[in-house]
UniProtKB/Swiss-Prot annotation:
Protein known as: 9-cis-epoxycarotenoid dioxygenase NCED6, chloroplastic
Keyword Lyase: no
One Pfam family, short name: RPE65
Organism expressing this protein natively: Arabidopsis thaliana
Cofactor-binding details, from the entry: Binds 1 Fe(2+) ion per subunit.
Chief location category: plastid
Amino acid sequence: MQHSLRSDLLPTKTSPRSHLLPQPKNANISRRILINPFKIPTLPDLTSPVPSPVKLKPTYPNLNLLQKLAATMLDKIESSIVIPMEQNRPLPKPTDPAVQLSGNFAPVNECPVQNGLEVVGQIPSCLKGVYIRNGANPMFPPLAGHHLFDGDGMIHAVSIGFDNQVSYSCRYTKTNRLVQETALGRSVFPKPIGELHGHSGLARLALFTARAGIGLVDGTRGMGVANAGVVFFNGRLLAMSEDDLPYQVKIDGQGDLETIGRFGFDDQIDSSVIAHPKVDATTGDLHTLSYNVLKKPHLRYLKFNTCGKKTRDVEITLPEPTMIHDFAITENFVVIPDQQMVFKLSEMIRGGSPVIYVKEKMARFGVLSKQDLTGSDINWVDVPDCFCFHLWNAWEERTEEGDPVIVVIGSCMSPPDTIFSESGEPTRVELSEIRLNMRTKESNRKVIVTGVNLEAGHINRSYVGRKSQFVYIAIADPWPKCSGIAKVDIQNGTVSEFNYGPSRFGGEPCFVPEGEGEEDKGYVMGFVRDEEKDESEFVVVDATDMKQVAAVRLPERVPYGFHGTFVSENQLKEQVF
């Protein structure tokens, strides 16, 4: 694998491509499908040349003589002992850089704001603001294994103004980890999934500890990558991943991005939070979880009011640290998954990964009252054959007999360790309804849509914690790429699809409501990559009929990424720094 990053990974300039303004038609099959045809007008070239993306230029810190000697010695230990140990370990596809950083998963350089982008169609006037999407984009070549989740966080931003005026930019989130590695000009922080495996992983940890001991690096200021989730709360855009505190990112008046710094909610917390906090649309409160792999309590539930003040900090008792990427809220409760992927650092001593799939473990959901102060009244309900990496919504109902029920909508993945290891089994991700009877402590799971992988999506955020009808979700086929968007009526299983077309793939769709009308009155947006023509686009789809209304040709390649959000014009004005 080539390890020379940046210039060799810049997109090649190609001739102007045809672009789509679909005239969808209904396919006569069991599900209503609106197909995007490929008869499309031609986009003109950009009116002016686009400058090459900028990169962070390493500047080396001033070391005293003893530090230089120690650093040189540790470098020799790395090259003569640690790296050979890592190279002797066969890499499965989920941690093989040749796989994880291939094609449109490869990293790109930062791109300053590019204005005056070509738009085909008309962007609705209600969409004034900035679409933000987070993703993993390693600054430096991996030294050994590399998992998709290990890359440095990079945010891609599409700013939409009046009269079809659109700009684009992308910037690294300047985490403490990235700032230190940039100063050193190389990767030095351990990659939690790609590198921390077996004895070579222990050696990598020992090497990092030694470098920290001589003052070359400092892990106390944060070791996270902030590459997964984004949320706008209390005047702040926060980028986050489960390995650290969030990072605040400023969106300036030109649509550029600037990292403000690590954000501990005004020093009210000092531990990492998960990538998917929930903002209650009714109260405005932010709910989240924080877990600690090394010590108890392994999990805490946190709540912040609209002013950003922490109003709940509740310990959740778990027998072992569990990987939790997402959770759900209802009007009165918090729904917490405790599933089969757990952390066991002792497995590294035995030559394995610290993130393991415990096949015999029974998945369960904990239901905690938002008013609970101690966590002692949490109710656990077993949910067999269930592993949900993402939960899309939850709400409260009652059975005909009057039993209280929590309804959870999530994507159930099989095998559960698909993302982390090679099981040899085909991946299935089933959009499911999970019903938790709070009187009988029994559960029932029903697959809403069969025969298609549905993962990474949005609902109308006004319905978070309340009964909803629709979810807009990526069609993850061929796995792990996404070939289109499915609008799913979760009440009756009806599906409408917007397909990107041959050799065209995207990611998580982002739903933006239009006013306060019907639940599906709004627009779905996201990035699309044409792998055959080597071009990237930003598309906007009418959520009611799943027809494309506008598309923007982007000046640079946008890699596949993770999660996004839309920051409205009013929210931009409310930013605080």
